[in-house]
Curated annotation (Swiss-Prot):
Keyword Hydrolase attached: no
Protein's recorded name: AMP/ADP-polyphosphate phosphotransferase
Highest taxon of source: Bacteria
Cofactor: Mn(2+)
EC number: 2.7.4.-
Length: 267
């Protein structure tokens, strides 16, 4: 899925990516759902292998505008995986304790251990997105954080962490429809907050901030993928495909038993 991977050449432009794009899958929604079911079963096996081998660490970062589909992606793509080896870490407004430390402190505590796959629902990237858009810190502060993040992720990669970063790219009109659906559906209304409307008014500034963050921090060791996310079925299939392809590339193997257990007969 090279077309969705952001190259570290400093030329990334978000406008080149169409949130309605479905060109990487030959077929419609139903065929994609069937393909996703196959990928889910494959991911289940690969995650079991990751856990059993206990050597690799995998970090998946999900970022998106409000209503961009982070929760839905986690729910669908990781359906069926073993909870003992998979963990979701969500990053909301920093607590008083977190604010008393550097902004990466709370993030570093949540990175995966050997054999574990961790999904970041939002992440350290909020500290070059929200803080920039809402002027929470001076420019000279958030500007330095691009370098901090590159070096932080370089350290994780050097220590054996495979990093995949996904920006779930939706259009402004698609966001409007999804937010309205939340308001109109009593079972989804709990997800709506008034701050969503404030952030929506800052749409263009957020797009600029995302473009800069992705351009500055997509590297060979921690690449960004821009995922067209207006259509949920395509988003889920594409994220799953990239994840499965990456895990297969790790060439993992089940560990050898301590003894020749295949010869043991239990009486």
């Amino acid at each position: 899925m090279k077309k969705y991977r952001v190259q570290p050449d400093g030329r990334f432009e978000l406008k080149r990516f169409d949130p309605d794009d479905t060109s990487a899958f030959e077929g419609g929604k139903q065929a994609a759902l069937e393909a996703l079911a196959v990928l889910n079963r494959r991911l289940e096996k690969l995650q079991e292998l990751l856990y059993a081998e206990g050597q690799h660490k995998v970090l998946v970062v999900l970022q998106a505008m409000d209503a961009g589909g982070k929760d839905g992606t986690i729910r669908v793509v990781f359906d069926g995986v073993n909870p003992s080896g998979v963990r979701v870490a969500s990053f909301g407004v920093p607590t008083e304790q977190e604010l008393a430390r550097d902004y990466l402190w709370r993030v570093h505590q949540q990175v995966p251990r050997k054999g574990e796959l961790v999904i970041f629902n939002r992440s350290h990237y909020e500290d070059v997105l929200v803080v920039r858009v809402k002027n929470l810190v001076p420019q000279q502060v958030w500007q330095k954080r691009y370098r901090h993040i590159r070096e932080f992720e370089r350290m994780l990669a050097d220590e054996g962490t495979t990093i995949l970063k996904f920006f779930l790219h939706i259009s402004k009109d698609e966001q409007r429809q999804r937010l309205q659906e939340r308001l109109d559906n009593p079972e989804k209304r709990w997800k709506f907050r008034m701050g969503d409307l404030e952030d929506r008014r800052l749409w263009d500034r957020y797009q600029e901030a995302y473009e800069a963050a992705i351009r500055e921090t997509s590297t060979e060791y921690a690449p960004w993928y821009v995922i067209p996310a207006n259509k949920n079925w395509y988003r889920n299939w594409l994220v799953s495909h990239i994840l499965v392809e990456t895990l297969e590339g790790l060439a993992m193997q089940y560990p050898q038993p301590e003894t020749a257990s295949e010869k043991i007969v239990i009486e």
